[in-house]
UniProtKB/Swiss-Prot annotation:
SUPFAM superfamilies: Glutathione synthetase ATP-binding domain-like, PreATP-grasp domain, Rudiment single hybrid motif. Binds 1 Mg(2+) or Mn(2+) ion per subunit. PROSITE patterns: ATP_GRASP, GARS. It comes from Leifsonia xyli subsp. xyli (strain CTCB07). HAMAP family: GARS (MF_00138). This is Phosphoribosylamine--glycine ligase.
Length: 417
């Protein structure tokens, strides 16, 4: 199959790695890609992935049979819509359904209409409204940017002044949501949807805070592990019945079918499962730990979702064992990451058994060919093992071989798994 993958992160590298592992011999092009992706498949760095007309023209000209949209920005920009209008199978929701991630207010309304369990929330358009809502809920305070914020739009704090400052920062871009604090274990569950049917992948847990012990600011994610052996066997079915299917049905009823990856950000509380957030695409870094164990060919799931033929397909199968990923980030991430520094030692890191490297913010120097860090989250070290101890040992062994001045990573990923 000829497949176009839009995106340039470790998530997209993991998707491409899974597609290349199939026996089908897919012809894959990535746009814009990164240095690691460019070493595996052809890339089209000049394609404007936020321009639906440009992406559609490129897909038609090159005869792509499936387009996979990785990041949230092209989805919220509506890139999937012109592709669908031209009859090109695309994995990713259209602009309207992508508001499930693009607007926290929209997502809360959908949850309320569908009867999906979630925390109470108040939308605030002014600082005074935010302050009033903070006082209503009390500490710990939870404030979320209403729109896209690269995973950094949420603050959970005991400090009212910090919560108010966070609200003030994002009120310059739009509204914010002030929510009740939910206490429990967080779970990420991916579900493939064709607009009517959902099929679940393996649950994962990610680490959003920058520092060990869940300290420091929120990030796009510093690591993850899967499977979650501490979850009850009924967990996935309960999420399908109480969260995923009601949401998919509600969106279908509103003539905005959700076709793509429904990411359910969940928390298991003393009162049951609650939804923290929805995303409209594969999560990063959870994708890096979910896909390596996937036995069912990923392309069959993506194509079936894109063509409305998931019904009747068996649930995806996963190999035994565990997967752990640890993110290597640049100095001063997430505030002002230092970029342009050389990266070395990746071949040595990849030589550790059962380890792969998923590139994110990497590029080649056009003159010297040196590998450079170009952003905050630089790469993900992905390790498999029979046990989490095995996988963790391999991941951190590999990380110790990578050299990037000022780089940082958490040392406690999957330590309690």
């Amino acid at each position: 199959m000829k497949i176009l993958v839009l995106g340039s992160g470790a998530r997209e590298h993991a998707i491409i790695t899974a597609l290349l592992a199939e026996r089908a011999g897919h012809d894959i092009v990535a746009a814009p890609g990164n240095a690691g992706i460019a070493a595996d498949v052809a890339v089209e760095p000049g394609l404007d992935t936020l321009n639906g007309a440009a992406v559609t023209a490129f897909a038609i000209e090159n005869g792509f049979e499936l387009v996979v949209i990785g990041p949230e920005a092209p989805l919220v920009a509506g890139v999937a819509d012109p592709l669908r209008r031209r009859g090109i199978p695309v994995f990713g929701p259209g602009r309207a359904a992508a508001q499930l991630e693009g607007s926290k207010t929209f997502a809360k309304r959908i949850m309320d209409e569908a009867g999906v369990p979630t925390g109470r929330a108040v939308r605030a358009a002014t600082l005074a409204e935010a302050g009033s809502a903070l006082d209503e809920f009390g500490a710990p305070y939870v404030v979320k940017a209403d729109g896209l914020a690269a995973g950094k739009g949420v603050i959970v704090t005991e400090d009212r002044a910090a919560a108010l400052a966070h609200a003030a920062r994002y009120l310059t871009h739009g509204s914010v949501l002030v929510e009740e604090f939910l206490d429990g274990e967080e779970v990420s569950l991916f579900l493939v949807s064709d607009g009517h049917t959902v099929l679940p992948l393996s649950p994962a847990q990610d680490y959003k805070r920058l520092l060990d012990g869940d300290a420091g600011p929120n990030t796009g994610g510093m690591g993850a592990y899967s499977p979650l052996t501490w979850l009850p066997e009924t967990f996935v079915d309960e999420v399908i019945d109480t969260v995923a299917m009601p949401t998919v049905r509600q969106l279908a009823a509103e003539q905005t079918p959700f076709i793509g990856l429904l990411y359910c950000g969940l928390i298991v509380t003393a009162k049951g499962i609650r939804v923290i957030e929805f995303n409209a695409r594969f999560g990063d870094p959870e994708t890096q730990v979910v896909l390596p164990r996937l036995v069912t060919p990923l392309s069959t799931l993506l194509f079936a979702a894109a063509t409305g033929t998931l019904s009747g397909m068996p649930r995806p199968e996963f190999a035994p064992g565990t997967t752990v990923t640890v993110v290597l980030a640049s100095e001063d991430y997430p505030e002002s990451p230092r970029t342009g520094r050389p990266i070395a030692g990746l071949d040595e890191a990849a030589s550790v058994p059962e380890v792969t490297i998923a590139h994110a913010s990497t590029a080649r120097d056009e003159t010297t060919g040196a590998l450079l860090a170009t952003g905050g989250r630089v790469l993900s070290v992905v390790a498999r093992g029979a046990t989490f101890a095995d996988a963790r040992t391999r991941a951190y062994d590999a990380l110790s071989r990578i050299r990037l001045d000022g780089s940082q990573y958490r040392t406690d990923i999957a330590a309690r798994a």
